[in-house]
Amino acid sequence: MFIFLFTVFLILILILFYISFRLYNFALNPKSSKEGIFNSKDNNEPRFQDTWIYDYKDKEDVFINSFDNLKLHGYILKTENSDKWAITVHGYTNKAESMSAMAYKYHSLGYNILMPDLRGHGKSEGSYVGMGWHDRLDILKWIDLIIKENKDSKILLHGISMGAGTVMMVSGEELPENVKVIIEDCGYTSAKEQLAYNLKTMFKLPSFPILNFCSLITKIKDNYFLSEASAIKQLQKAKVPILFIHGDKDKFVPFYMLDKLYNACSSKKDKLVVKDVGHAKSESLKSDLYWNKVEEFIKPYM
């Protein structure tokens, strides 16, 4: 009887590890197909600013080495006689160029721009998706790069989706005085809660115990537990002013996360709810509303 029960237990453990590894490979391996993750259809023609970066001739390729010795890539776009900098941080499965519209706007406002490729994305090295946790340390290195070049720099961070998760996780670190303000657009509370939501909505699967096993895999392979990648915990230590933005029809990073993030934030803060807009569409669909609020919020600090 004992042998039978032990065998059943072992089979269940193996099945759970298999499911968890499949989840890890699907969600956190940057090289695996992400087909089916984003189901929203966008039939809108791209605006000039959405593709502007591809034709911009004066962008400079720059590289840093991460704390774990990955070669990370970014673009710098200079503006003469300006100490203002915007670091635009892209989302899950994207790359630096996907922040073209943000870069275009800030550049038109007289900012220098740094557009990093997050680890495992674009031209940056990396074999896993950091969900913002290790990425936060990478952004700190990018901040240092700017300050070394311009000690009087005033730096703004603006992230979308996973990029928003990243800049919120940056907010809980000891930041140099040069970092003045943060904009987060449709970010999540934590990697664990986000994946639990996606498991439920996409696959009709429970988070327990699948995410526990998946988190063990991320620790073994990538050196972080999913529970560590928490914007909530980092926001509780934040000192830099933060603007929170979320579309109320977001079905990928659920809208209810906005208030959880906002309430957790210990620094000066404001929020913008964008009506009838889905995931990561606030800027493109309600551009005037979006930028009026952003410019109003950042003005006292930049």
What feature does the model see in each segment?
Residues 237-239, 244-246, 250:
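Short beta-strand/loop motif that positions the catalytic acidic residue
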Residues 4-65:
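An N-terminal hydrophobic leader/cap segment in hydrolases
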Residues 92-105:
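The serine-hydrolase catalytic nucleophile loop
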Residues 285-302:
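Catalytic active-site module of serine/aspartate enzymes centered on a nucleophile-bearing elbow/loop
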Residues 102, 231, 240, 254-263:
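Short alpha-helix in the alpha/beta-hydrolase fold that links the catalytic acid
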Residues 129-150:
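Alpha/beta-hydrolase active-site loop
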Residues 106-125:
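Conserved alpha/beta-hydrolase
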Residues 169-224:
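Hydrolase active-site cap/lid region
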